[in-house]
């Protein structure tokens, strides 16, 4: 029964996000009180991610060091560069532009690992990239935000770095430690973490919308266009670079997904903490869109594999005749 509830919540998360968004525009006072709790909720998600990691995941980093390094560098070059280009191309106002920058400068999100599994990508590489990107995030994310946006908004580098350490790195490492010492108990908790993560995303989106409903109504379509282009830039350039570096099919799929999908929950949280609620809009929309685009890409990959399998069977049958 519990597994069915978890599957339902994760499967229909995107619908839940849209519904809470509409609800929060008309009744903003309901979700506003949850806003101060978002950093804590994000920390619990990262704690859950840590509990899902095993010693084998860390070993995989050393099995594919070159590919993990390529993915990490691409993650922190392509998405920030795409954000920089898009905010200038669309001439976004600073309060909205900072949200796009935050999305671009954050590490990959854990949803990428699920999408990689569905797409029959290299899941071990995907998990390794997410893990390494997340560990580097406290230092790289504030620096990139300062580099891109420091000229037009005030960036408190040290404070942002410490916030990411507290919300992301420490919970992650504590989760890893608990999983190492108490693996049996952790297995039970891990079954409900996907549902909890989905609920936190829904709450975060509700808070962002409740605090910036007017801005969304005035600029929503433009922000949606920027978010879609941002995600597509990441996936297309990630795919192109992976091919150029000679990665195989499964690795290329993992790189495509990993570079294009971001920890948008962290982006929205940082926007609410350090800038304005309007800065969280891009992250809120990205939370929905990257799951849609990721699922579409996974379906495309599965379809391609099925076609290739059919062609192989036909060729084999012809040869036998």
Predicted regions located by residue number:
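Alpha-helical transmembrane segments of multi-pass small-molecule/ion transporters
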Residues: 1-321
């Amino acid at each position: 029964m519990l597994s069915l509830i978890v599957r339902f919540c994760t499967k229909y998360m995107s619908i839940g996000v849209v519904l809470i968004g509409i609800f929060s525009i008309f009744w903003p006072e309901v979700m506003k009180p949850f806003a101060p709790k978002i950093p804590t909720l994000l920390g619990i998600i990262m704690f859950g991610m840590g509990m899902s990691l095993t010693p084998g995941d860390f070993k995989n980093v050393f099995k594919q060091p070159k590919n993990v390094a390529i993915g990490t560098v691409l993650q922190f070059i392509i998405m920030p560069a795409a954000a920089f280009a898009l905010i200038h191309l669309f001439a976004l106002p600073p309060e909205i532009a900072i949200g796009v920058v935050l999305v671009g400068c954050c590490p990959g999100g854990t949803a990428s690992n699920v999408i990689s599994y569905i797409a029959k990508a290299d899941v071990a590489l995907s998990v390794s990239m997410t893990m390494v990107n997340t560990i580097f995030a406290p230092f790289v994310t504030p620096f990139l935000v300062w580099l891109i946006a420091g000229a037009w908004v005030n960036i408190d580098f040290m404070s942002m770095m410490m916030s990411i350490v507290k919300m992301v790195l420490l919970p992650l490492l504590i989760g890893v430690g608990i999983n190492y010492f108490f693996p049996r108990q952790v297995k039970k908790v891990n079954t409900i973490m996907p549902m909890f993560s989905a609920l936190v995303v829904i709450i975060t989106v509700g808070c962002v919308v409740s605090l910036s409903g007017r801005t969304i109504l005035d600029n929503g379509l433009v922000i949606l266009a920027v978010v879609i282009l941002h995600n597509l830039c990441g996936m297309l350039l990630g795919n192109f670079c992976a091919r150029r570096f000679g990665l195989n099919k499964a690795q290329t799929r993992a790189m495509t997904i990993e570079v294009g999908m971001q920890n948008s929950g962290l982006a929205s949280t940082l926007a609410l903490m350090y800038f304005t609620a309007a800065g969280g809009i891009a992250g809120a929309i990205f939370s929905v869109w990257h799951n849609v685009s990721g699922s579409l890409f996974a379906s495309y990959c599965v379809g391609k594999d099925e076609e290739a399998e059919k062609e192989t069977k036909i060729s084999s049958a012809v040869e036998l005749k």
